[in-house]
């Protein structure tokens, strides 16, 4: 927010003139009660002992100096035990409109150089279609990539294909047994096979293309079924994600880790750290020394790799490719996996802030108030494709992003389909459409709004509601920064909901097109146009469209 930077710059100069240093624990934020000002700062309380004075007296001195040297400050006063509360002038807040007009689509973006980020998300086993839980992870991961790019980071996105484990062998077996069943052969079903209709569809397609398939030896038949099933399912996943406006820049195969020597390279890196050892013909990683609850096997006595070994190799490979911040989006059921992966990152010699995990909690899908049961293996789940078809990509993404990702989410399908202000995504999109409608009507009535507003055009913006809307629009930059810092995309949806609420309230209280007051009309049109730009920019972070009419 320009207000925070303005206050920080002015106050830092005052503190330096006093022979003091800017306190690292300084907090500049809006006071709880907006009647107490636009911003409150605690510097005086942090510096009082060093300045050998009373915190409140120091706050009073800071307030007086701010009024003297900062023309944008309309009011500054000491409050409480030593806060300094600051109110900016209306002219200062009106400048928000010109800031937004100048930046356009780039409004809210950071100009600071960022980090090289590798963001891995979804990465569902290609054993079946994506379900709504995967959809939430997809929405969070894709929007997080958009958010981090806004914050100045260079973000590469990947989908890790688990194509080398037991689940894939079980997938091939499940399709093979369906092929035999469709051919009238006797079949003994294992307890944990995949039962969905999609398995039957793949088996039927294979049998139609090759009627002699059931006569093949089981190992060869299972391999063919595995290859066909994985290819079909993975293509379906890619199609679903494309429909959901989700793009992964690379699809990384687990199998390639062994083929390219990435596993050996990772083991060598861990060996240099002194945390690996051999015991009982197995290769171990001493994660207990690094905060895990026990040591972990990487290579079993039969020579096969554990899942953990592959994951370590994959993360080591990411660092080797030059990325300095790895972010994984995992299901909440993987929470216990974080300490051992952090141990591996530490053993590689990387800093703690080089690895973060965003957890995705369960989605409780509701239809007519009743929960929809989901089980991938039983084939009784609601797919992401089904949800997109029923409620649309916009509603699905916004709903998935409406709560903190590590909190369970109730997804009400009926609510998501409503074309009313009770529907959260409709509420925000309608704010944008409403602004566009006003601008169209204004043009039809002959009001000509210049591309860039000047101080004279904006001067009629002088009501309390004008200032409230301006302050909220100005807060967009800080909100994006805080959301990126915390990896919390839900902050964006919450902000947009609040901004839309202020816009709807403003529209209800104030007539925008005034036949007898052209100057005020143009000022309000400029205000609404800038708010519309902020709504568009925010919806873009969420991967949600901003319709011009609804």
Curated annotation (Swiss-Prot):
Disulfide partners: none
EC annotation from Swiss-Prot or TrEMBL: 6.1.1.19
Coiled-coil ranges per UniProt: none
Family matches, as SMART domains: Arg_tRNA_synt_N (SM01016), DALR_1 (SM00836)
GO CC, alphabetical: cytoplasm
SUPFAM superfamilies: Anticodon-binding domain of a subclass of class I aminoacyl-tRNA synthetases, Arginyl-tRNA synthetase (ArgRS), N-terminal 'additional' domain, Nucleotidylyl transferase
GO molecular function, one term: arginine-tRNA ligase activity
Keyword tags: Aminoacyl-tRNA synthetase, ATP-binding, Cytoplasm, Ligase, Nucleotide-binding, Protein biosynthesis
Keyword Cytoplasm part of the UniProt annotation: yes
Sequence motif 'HIGH' region, residues: 124-134
InterPro entries, alphabetized: aa-tRNA-synth_I_CS, Arg-tRNA-ligase, Arg-tRNA-synth_N, Arg-tRNA-synth_N_sf, ArgRS_core, DALR_anticod-bd, Rossmann-like_a/b/a_fold, tRNAsynth_Ia_anticodon-bd
Subcellular location: Cytoplasm
Catalytic activity: tRNA(Arg) + L-arginine + ATP = L-arginyl-tRNA(Arg) + AMP + diphosphate
Transferase found in the keyword field: no
EC top class, as a word: ligase
HAMAP family reported in the protein's UniProt record: Arg_tRNA_synth (MF_00123)
NCBIfam families: argS
Subunit structure: Monomer.
Protein's name according to its UniProt entry: Arginine--tRNA ligase
Source species: Desulfovibrio desulfuricans (strain ATCC 27774 / DSM 6949 / MB)
Lineage: Bacteria, Pseudomonadati, Thermodesulfobacteriota, Desulfovibrionia, Desulfovibrionales
Gene name, Swiss-Prot/TrEMBL: argS
